[in-house]
Amino acid sequence: MNALITICIILFAAAYLASAEHKPFPAVMPLEKPDYPISAAMARLYDEWNPHEDRGNELYSNFKYSRLNGFAEKENVSRRDPTKVIKVDGIYHVWYTSRRTTHSPVGLKNATDTIPATDWDLSDLWHATSTDGFTWVEDTEPAVTRPPKPEQGFRSICTPGILVWEGKYYLYFQAYSPMVGGQAYCPVRVAYADSPNGPWTHYPDSVILPGPKGSWNNIKINDPCPVVFNDEILIYYKGAPIERGHEMVLRMQGVSKSKDPLGPFFPSPINPVINGGHETCMFPFNGGVAALVALDGPEKNTMQWSPDGENFAVASMIQIPPVAPGPYCPDAFARGKTDGRGITWSLCHINPDGGGAVSKSILARFDCDLSLDVDHQVLKRNNLRFNAQSYFQSGVGLPKGWLRRILKEQEDLDQETIIH
């Protein structure tokens, strides 16, 4: 009997001690990771995020969009893919792809020398200025026109990226000949000028070429995005192979480096440096390089950060990210050691009908708090809600024609609820 009593006392004491160790998680969020057992989810909060959630994350923001003034909307006039915005002598400058054709895009099979295949086909690079970032004055002629045939780019030049280096201005762009499209050869070319107002001169050679046969970017280099980091010119870009299929790379992002804006540029030996994304958006941030990654890949719709410009990690998950952002980032091309203060606003493009390749685009502005110098808590909210039309619009609602298919699948798949 005494032995039984002793065992009961030991078990009771063990249970008491165990319950004491498993204290409830407090209402006041601990700033340090607790030293008592917590769930895997709570451990991630401290190990990968921070106890203040998105409120305390400098690389988290919402994006608040505004229409721009000054860009007249006309039939078959498209504006898209803005560069970073720069400010020179009190004036903001931006360059962008613009298609001005007599016909809307018709796809690759039906395109002609005058009828575009895609929204960025038969395009030139245009320029606009502003004193406040909301109202813009567009030049009356293109800043950079397509080079003459048979030079690379005679079909279309598009998706420019601006670099300011040693007092000169460089516009990098993708150059298509003889046709645009996902399986058309596309290197990066560059034009240069002594002033943001031009005139611009085409450099005769391509400066970044697609990779070798069998590589991840063997057919095209798109969306060149220059950043100066550690006294080097880094040009980020989207790449893809000519081969298509579920087993192939769809699109990823890489980087090439140079000390000279006209090259040669050397690709990173660990390319691709981002495992997805569509249009590129990189800027100096907090001693490293930040990237806004959207639309494609397993880490889509995230902000990422790299200490060296090549090894990126997810820093936050974002909602309703901009398409083709071109941020105002005054230290994007700063030489020497710079900490990178981040961005508070940017231009981007929107397809009014929700399309992509075969519809026109407009430029828009968004404001955000991806900056070390401001603290806009309204832009740090993470509980965004939308009206009914947002859920039923094209691209989000169930596609037309699918109702019959869904009903047929339900007949085969939907079983009676299991009740014991």
Label the model's feature ranges.
Residues 6-15:
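Bacterial N-terminal signal peptides
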Residues 21-420:
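Carbohydrate-active catalytic/glycan-binding domains of CAZyme proteins
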